[in-house]
Every structure is written in structure tokens, then in C-alpha cells.
UniProtKB/Swiss-Prot annotation:
Protein name: GTPase Obg
Main location: cytoplasm
Lineage: Bacteria, Pseudomonadati, Acidobacteriota, Terriglobia, Bryobacterales
EC number in record: 3.6.5.-
Bias (Basic and acidic residues) ranges: 61-74, 137-146
Single Gene Ontology MF annotation: GTP binding
Domain OBG-type G, residue spans: 159-330
Gene3D superfamilies, sorted: GTP1/OBG domain (2.70.210.12), P-loop containing nucleotide triphosphate hydrolases (3.40.50.300)
Amino acid sequence: MFIDEVRILVKAGDGGNGCLAFRREKFVPRGGPSGGDGGRGGDVTLVCSEHANTLLQFRFNPEHKAERGRHGEGSQRTGAEGRSIDVAVPVGTVVYDEATGERLYDFTVPGERFVVARGGRGGRGNQHFATPTHQAPTEHEPGRPGEEKRLRLELKLLADVGLVGFPNAGKSTLISRISAAKPKIAAYPFTTLEPNLGVVQMEGFRSFVVADIPGIIEGAHEGHGLGIQFLRHIERTRLLAHLVDVSEESGRDPVQDFEIIMQELARFSDQLVAKPMIVVATKMDVAQDPARVEALRDLAKSRDLPFFEISSATGQGIDALKHAMADRVLAPVPVPE
């Protein structure tokens, strides 16, 4: 888990101005005041959406402004209200007022709504200022300004996809290839000493979070290697991507590596090993023995697990893998009616 944080500006619509007008009718040379009121400004509402996974979209669009109300008109006509806007945020987003530090709202359930900036009231037209002794008032009010706030949005990110596999199976290299994360990468075990998380951006501002879980070794469920604490990080992921080095450089058997990791997951938690999983053969650019790849493919097929071949160095298979992950963890985008 890590904290994603963005700062945004929200501005509700100003109210429309009240109108200064008088009745103009035939045979009524001195008609009374008829200025209508200004319309109310639109609100800015934050809406908790299951279709939002991260705060990435706010980095591209940090300002959100509702429409101002229309001005009042003669004949006591009130101006139209400004259009309000809804701004989607992910479940788990906490909203703070940047100026005061006050915690304004904590979104926990899809569909929750919070009006974060209210539109300004429309100004009164001159019809409201007439009295028995003041029958031709020229007073009229400007609209009230809509609320404007600078907000800090904070999201505790849980990974949608957990990358598991032996040390140096290529997890850190893959996450650096498909996201903006820059984990430490080197050719020795336990380069990754804590989970790295990266946000993977897809088309249409959709995104999901991938966690590069530190290398699991035999005995991890008992605390060996980097221990049990890192297995806990993948308990709440929606998909496991099991990376297996199929090159000869490792000096290891890909099938045996796969089986050992599966045993460690099962010993830690039955629910963990039952999670949706895909199998990813890594380092295909330096894999010289096709039999090693085929053996792993056959094993994945026997367990009814999708199988992918990639090279993070050359980009082979990366796009197909990204889309396969997205298809499994992102909710379908609703089609407008």
C-alpha cells in the first residue's frame, strides 16, 4: 500500500446578477420595477465511482469549474441556474481542505456524493426594492460568488495486480516498463526490499495499480528470505501475475520455480493460491531453449492458467500483457445511453 496524492482546484459557479428593469407597457408611462433575479451558480460535487482506480486523471485535469448562473431579465424573469458538475473519485479517497488542513470527507462506498463547493446565490432584481415611498428603485444586487477551494485528495492505493516470482524473475524490470515507477534493478537477489507500486495508464484515462512484490523464495511462509510480511501485501490484490525466468542464465528449472512459488502461496493462505492468476514467461530475448518455455506453457495449460511470453528488454509481448491485466481488473466502462 502507498499513498497517492494530488492537489486540485474546485470553483462553483457565481450567481447571476439581479436585473434593473421597469415595466414598459402601452398607456403605462411609469411602469413599476420588473427586474428579475439572477440564477444560482452550479455546484461542484465529488462522486465516488467504482470505475475510477487512481488519482491519475487529476494530474492532467487539476481544475474543475461549474457554470455561473444567468443574469436576471426584465418582466420579472429569473436567470437560469448554472450547470453543476460531478467529479469522479475512487473508493478510498480522502478529501482535505488545502488551506486549513481540515478533513472534509472520506469516500468508502461507490455512489457516495459530497457537494464540495456550492454555487453562489443569484442577486435580487430591482423589483424587490420597491416600497410605498420608493416606487422606482434602481437598486439591484450582483450575484454572490461561488465557493472556491483548493483541495488535497489522498488515496491509499492497494494493488490491483501483484507480481510474484523468484528474485530476479524480472518483476522490477516489468513494472518499470509498463508504468512510471522506477524501482531499483540489479542482477542479485532481493534488489527489491519493499513493494514497489506503479500506476499503469490505459486508454480513456483508465488505470490500474501493479505491485512488484519482493522476491519470494522457498520457506517464505516461515519468514525465510524477505519473509511473510510481503506475502500479506498481495492478499488484497485482484490478480496475480506469476513471473518465471525461462532463460538459461538463472541456472534454474522454470517448472520447479513455478511449483515452489505456488507451494509457498498455498502454505501461507488457501485464498491466496485460489486468486485469479496468469503465468508470464520472462526474458524471452535471451531464452535459447524452446523446451523450457514449452514445459512452462504446458504446466500453465494443465492448470487452466493464461500464459504469456514477454521480454521487458525488447518490449516483446508487453502490450498484450498490459491489456490482459486491464481486462481482468478494470470494471467495464459504462456505455452512454
